[in-house]
C-alpha cells in the first residue's frame, strides 16, 4: 500500500510564500521526471530520496495527465482518489498526483528510488 500526504497551498502573484515556506524557482525536471511547462510556485520538500516536490500548473487536470502520458508513456497504475489523479511509474517508485487547484492544478511529484 502506498501512503503519502497531500500538501495544499494557496498563493497569489504578490505573495510567493506557502505556509511559511518560500516558493523556489521551478526546475525543468525533478529526479528525471519532467515538470509541466511554465510550472510555478515550486516547493521542494526533500531532494534526497525519498524526495518530493509540489508545483502549480496553469492547466486543467486532464491536460496535465496528458502531458505526463506524452512525456513518460502510459502509467503502470492510474487511479482517481478524492478528485485527484494518481499516476504511478516504475513499480510505484515514481508517483505523480494531480489535484484541482483554483484555475489550474497542483502537482505533487514523489520519488522513492531511481
Where would I find each of the regions flagged by the language model?
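Bacterial N-terminal signal peptides
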Residues: 1-8
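An acidic-aromatic pocket/loop used at catalytic or ligand-binding sites
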Residues: 9-114
